[in-house]
């Protein structure tokens, strides 16, 4: 903190807030930090333990109370600002206890005043674990409070913004830098700016006094106070503590572009350096301030001070105004701090009422904000929101040589020092230090008037916002991202941030949800946050930044705005921020623009009217009122909910006058302003979720994306257009004060009136799509999702309920924690007043918010969607898409479009827990006064601040989900949801998802190698058939499903009348010869000429293969899409391709995006691939069939022979019993294959015929057996494993055939038979015996050893079999075959009897190859049992064994006289004992004592198996 001296000029802390951070939540945090209500919230930049001590908290509350007066008097005397500033420097107010330095590691160490902090920043910094930049003493707070008029961050919970949970440290740093630059630009100047700056300070002072008020003097940061507050808030709202100060700075610092960067970079910690500047998290800031020169915000700003840094922040960063003089910074901190104190006392939202922060994070006093309590509440809520985003908040420190200006905010400015995690826990507001009254509240890059338009035009530029809205109501919006992606920064951040805060555990919503949380409504925190932060714009100069912002917001802005649009719903604050930027013109306006401050919670409450309510509450419109409520909610989502009054201090009923003051400062015109946040076109095109990617390049990408009109952007644009009609206010807001009047402008205009020029100025920024918008729940009337949409809807034709109550409340709910909403309910009158505005605001800013609950309950989700919320959301989302990576973009767009279904459905589809919770909470927070508005706001605020709250509100299920789903719907059918046709968006999304899956698989197939040569081979279906299989199995069906969706059954043909319609008909129609279809036509002709392609489906698939070869699949789809005549002719209105022109253009864009990668792959597919595949398949089947038939014949013959043989051998009883079973099995196996065999085996097991079956049923053995059996499915590859289970069941199961199991098992197992090709594994005879043995001796390697019980059972079965088998196996070789004859062995001829090895391995081909008849084979097998040659001695030696093998006997079929030497003569019916096979067709047999050769054809198996072995007659 000792680096403040380093700041020769103003240090702008640019708060880069990921989409989430861009939202008001940061400010909320700030408010939370500042507000007593925020006590529970953890300091986003420092752990709760770093939070303020109770004294600090009290002081903060007192300050907050004092600050409300300042807040009400944005143009507070410079003198008071100076006094405050000096106090800030001193770090001690008259009675201000020292605040813990939020940047300090130790909690309570930072009790010293800012001055002390500064003086002992190095030493005390460590002691000041809490980033208490300001003295804890209330007087100090008061001073700080006074200062806010001078300081941009005077009352705004900018710290909250600073510490947006969604923003990464680096991001935060960037925003800090940007803020610094911005502040330096705007700091000098006007009282109004000063007031705005005060507001910033308020944000910072309250929530992040250190960040804002203390910014000027690093050692005298208001951080101490801020952090104290943060610490106090921290318990309640982890993200709120220290958010007050930070709010100011964070919000101001983070521009939307910056936010996008932060979103991308939030991943990295404080060390993250953005191209434009150093991204510093609160922790980093703290460390630097204490130990390193850069530790100070001032020092950091110095290092990062450069226009580029600011410009970088412009997209997603807020520029914190760092006052040059520590005293000033302290004063500003104190001025913030008093507000913080008030907030702490009054729900930590009094801060809301404190000076609002302009887009540049400069706090300006909302002219009509008398309610410090509101600010406190807002701060609390914001703190919570920021808690979520805090971890992702990065602060850019920019040092501007505005020494004449109030000293730059101390390093303590929350933006700079907020760490993402800390921010999330208790985002210390990064209020711009309240400069001395003489010092300008804000630094304007441009003259205040210029900045106003710029800000209005481009909320994206925090600097612009700050400049334009300098003293105006930038508090809620301070964090508003200037870059369209930063929509998240503004509103998004507040909502999602608040929601995140409520979920503060997920400090870093690196996840999409978190991004939505911030950028989207509070409930949608992650999505919203992600959007704005992701694509931070990097502009070298503020002017450039502002221009870029303007472009993003006003013109090409829709993509950017779309991103912001996401925010937009959540980003009403953005609009407010823009308004805030316009603050120089009209604080009220600014307040409106500050809608993002909603996430600020307290800032929203106090500044909420400015940032959130500002549009809703700040102006005379009810919108402003809700904003404070929202802000309160944002600041202390839960805590605020606990004290709705403080939460909604903005409302007259609320005790927090700051919020009211802020609303009043907004001129009470917040109502008109709330919805004006941004026009559809200005909504962020990029997807709010992207920010989590933290690709700082996205800002540039974003610009490119806008230029390119990425699919998502296009989608968002269409959605915006539709939304725009419903929400002209939003559009105007985005465009600027002038645009605001365009439709939605009216509500905002009212706000503008209330806020004055400020509203107009910042409105464009608000209009600019905020990350929130895209991701905010679309199903809520689209205020967020389709902020423009909602706005327009509200302004133009929002359903009264939804438009006013729902929309108004929704944005706040999204942005602010539930507390704010309760505040809203507290001030039903105000809400009523601002409800119209709020509804408008919600429509355009919280359009998707309406789905949140309360008002949602009042209005159907569809209604909300119809209002344009959905569309707005969608539009916003597409904008955010620009920030997304191509894949993310693709998915975002897909999601946006997919939500095309009913609003409710859409919400459900994309439902994110946060939003759902918010929706549920909505009812919880519904209050009699403004059930819709307040409830919704509360829900939203809480949702963003804390996901639990969002969970509570079913309608606010998830900002992202709501935004995603409804936007597609809304965008597609902004004019009343073409849903009249009842289009199933989910089903449409499923079609696109199928294509996505196919493309992913194909791309993965090619991704196996990077070598072009290898890739070419991978794409060649003849070399790598897999690619062809993937295309045929996945891509072709997916594409066909798309083309078949909604396909008419018949098409009218001039000649034949009705003609059946099918995808191929569409191909025909779309490939008619034309200037651009020569290639397609040629392909069509080629495919049509293949006679092999016999069906339309085959032709269609071949056509797809050809399109892949010529890399024209995407082109063909686009061509088809462009020919609406073809589509109308062939498709129903609800068909995918028809709906792509109406309800879900985004889905089609997503489809095209998904198909794009295929144009880059080297396909060389055979158009007849499918035909050849089918042909080969047929051939294989035929071959198998033939094989099976021949096998069956052989098996049947052999089984018959062997059955008789085995019967004869085993004896009537045993043989009969076993042989039939075996034979049946064998036949079954041969015919039915493995299944039959297994079935037979199972039967055997069940019958208990097999020991295996018995023990398999037993406990231990049972489980092992089951495991063994079930495992074979996975180990089919292993012959042993698969055979084992089967054989065990068949062998042991054939257990009845004990002999085979045991006797043959042994020999056959020795040489495991190789699996046979033609036979099913189970059909192999060998395996069975092997199995028996295998069980005992070797189980499959994968199985481990069988249980002892199994082994014992096996032994017993063997012993049992042994007795039987031994007789049969006098020679194992011969006996085995006959007993089990191995069940398969006997079927196939020779089992083990021939040779152990051979029988085991014997394949059908083996014996088929033997050129012998079946009988010959049978005889051979029988004889082979005695492998020994038919030697007589062997025969004689065998005779003893012969009886044991009855099967070796044959019966003479006729009389035969030996005609040659060695032949045997016999009579018909004689029983001959087979001694073995002889040559050719002869058997060596014995008849009594005589032996000789017998023609095989003359003998057959004895009819009676029981015939005695030796009964052969001579």
Curated annotation (Swiss-Prot):
GO terms for cellular component: cytosol; plasma membrane. Residues 67-184, 201-220, 228-254, 402-444, 476-510, 547-603, 642-683, 732-832, 1204-1255, 1279-1405, 1423-1446 are annotated as: Disordered. The keyword ATP-binding does not apply. InterPro entries: Run_dom, Run_dom_sf, RUN_RUSC2, RUSC1_2, SH3-like_dom_sf, SH3_domain. The keyword Phosphoprotein applies. It is found in: Cytoplasm, Cytosol; Cell membrane. Residues 1232-1242 have a biased composition (Acidic residues). The RUN domain is required for the interaction with RAB1A and RAB1B. This is AP-4 complex accessory subunit RUSC2. It comes from Mus musculus.
